[in-house]
A protein has these predicted regions:
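Short acidic, hydrophobic short linear motifs in intrinsically disordered regions
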Residues: 21-29
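Short helix-to-turn junction characteristic of helix-turn-helix DNA-binding domains
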Residues: 15-19
Length: 121
């Protein structure tokens, strides 16, 4: 699947939360929080169908949309893309960056240590 834009992520979050969902329901929800024009939202939906992120099913006079990929799959792909683009694929460089920028709290560090301990090979 191709990477999805920030705007497409907003559509995906609605679809993941309420799948299956009609196009008008997606428009109603996103228009309320983003102020986007309904045509813009329909364009984003079409792009996501083209990218294979959501599927459309004809239901009488309207289309019903549902996620073709899970949120976890998209997060994994976005994470890998981000790591590759910003840190040459190095998770160590990412964590080092957060430590150097003083972005990790003591609680964050403890949680990371627990995650590392539980996943030690």
């Amino acid at each position: 699947m191709n990477n999805i834009s920030d705007s497409e992520w907003k559509v995906m979050k609605v679809v993941w939360k309420k799948s299956p969902i009609s196009g008008s329901e997606i428009v109603d929800e996103l228009e309320a929080v983003t102020g986007w024009n309904p045509k813009t939202i329909h364009t984003l939906i079409r792009r996501l169908v083209t990218k294979g992120a959501i599927n459309a099913k004809k239901e009488n006079t309207y289309y019903s949309y549902y996620a073709a990929v899970s949120e976890a799959e998209c997060v994994k792909e976005e994470t890998e893309t981000f790591l590759e683009k910003c840190f040459n694929g190095s998770l160590n460089m990412l964590v080092s960056n957060f430590i150097k920028e003083d972005k990790l709290t003591d609680q964050d560090i403890e949680e990371l240590q627990e995650i590392l301990k539980s996943n030690k090979r």
